[in-house]
Design a protein with these regions (language model features):
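Extracellular glycan-interacting surfaces
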Residues: 1-351
């Protein structure tokens, strides 16, 4: 990887920042070591600016590539996203379920109260199996072609959508039986094609209001978390997809006293079929692959963050973590030579 990169790893025991240097890695800083990091997102045009959410604490911003941090919002922060069309606009989601927006890089915030005005038939599904049994906003998707369109993944609770930057909302969860939703994104180049990773399946829809269908042919797993897209290899081809999977949910791993049996799968046909990826990795990974993130300058290169921990839970000690990297669209992988606690989230920015 020729371009310099800075990695931000949000772990079960705080945040660690590294920078690539002389074909190796140099630790830049550590922070929030008494906290659990559940969200990270950086700016597209200002790589020095990154946002980090600390559970039961607040949202923090760095303007100097992770050297110093400023608290900009208090709360149990579970998700953060920067508008892909404007680095000034940030959304953050919390537990219990609520959404906030800033138009000035996080200096001031406004809650979007319409989310809490959804019908009781929708809101009754917002819960979590661990105390205090409150759902949270796990993932925020801002449509890159129309930033007025927002999707929220509620863990647990389903998917809700807004066409007006959060002034009004509708539930679009039909077709997904178990509403433990992790990540949603649209297929690049296809405005209305969406995919969802959940705790009980991987789904697709060309109009979420009409329902979701499974897209799991060849996967052989039932738990899904992060996924991303690679640029098409040639004109007329679909973007390739890479998804992180496991056998059973974290509750099953604990009850059976085993690891996640995690694996990576890849699709070149819009999720119609999947093939095993991940040469260089064990057949069944004990830690879960919680995070997938592109190299900021090399879109065929991807980092993966692994952690022996349960995402969504904002307590516990967790086990070991690891970061691995692929330079060939997810086919072959090798360890990044750095040590860290169980990773939960990951961000890569230009250095």
């Amino acid at each position: 990887m020729s371009e310099g990169v800075r990695l931000y790893a949000g772990t079960q025991h705080g945040l660690i920042v590294w920078r690539s240097k002389n074909c190796g890695w140099e630790e830049v800083s550590r922070g929030f070591e008494d906290g659990i990091i559940d969200s990270i997102h950086g700016c597209h045009d200002h790589p020095e600016r990154v946002y980090v959410g600390v559970t039961h604490n607040g949202l923090y911003r760095t303007d100097d590539r992770g050297r110093t941090w400023k608290k900009i919002l208090a709360g149990d922060i579970r998700s953060v996203a920067v508008d892909p069309t404007s680095d000034d606009v940030i959304y953050t989601g919390v537990e219990p379920v609520a959404l906030y927006r800033s138009e000035d890089c996080g200096d001031t915030w406004k809650e979007l109260p319409a989310l809490k005005s959804l019908p009781e038939s929708v809101r009754k599904n917002w819960w979590f199996p661990q105390p205090p049994h409150q759902g949270h906003v796990r993932n925020i998707f801002i449509h890159p072609d129309n930033p007025r369109i927002l999707y929220l993944c509620i863990e647990h609770g389903g998917i809700v959508r807004s066409f007006d930057r959060g002034a009004s909302w509708e539930d679009v969860s039909r077709g997904i039986e178990y509403l433990d939703i992790h990540v949603i994104a649209n297929l690049p180049g296809r405005f209305d094609r969406y995919y969802v990773a959940s705790a009980r399946g991987f789904f697709t829809s060309d109009e979420p209001a009409n329902g979701w269908v499974r897209a799991e042919n060849g996967l052989g797993r039932d738990y899904f978390h992060d996924f991303l897209f690679f640029p098409p290899e040639r004109a007329g081809k679909n973007p390739a997809m890479l998804v992180a999977t496991a056998e059973g949910s974290p509750g099953v791993w604990r009850r059976e006293g085993r690891g996640a049996r995690a694996a990576l799968f890849k699709s070149d046909d819009g999720a119609k079929s999947w093939q095993r990826a991940g040469r260089g990795l064990p057949e069944n990974l004990d830690p879960m692959v919680w995070a997938l993130v592109h190299h900021p300058a090399e879109r065929n290169s991807v980092f993966a963050g692994l952690g022996a921990v349960a995402r969504g839970h904002a307590s516990g000690t967790g086990g070991a973590g690891k970061i691995v990297v692929s330079r060939d669209r997810g086919e072959n992988w090798q360890d990044v030579p750095i040590q860290l606690p169980a990773d939960r989230v990951l961000w890569a920015a230009g250095d």
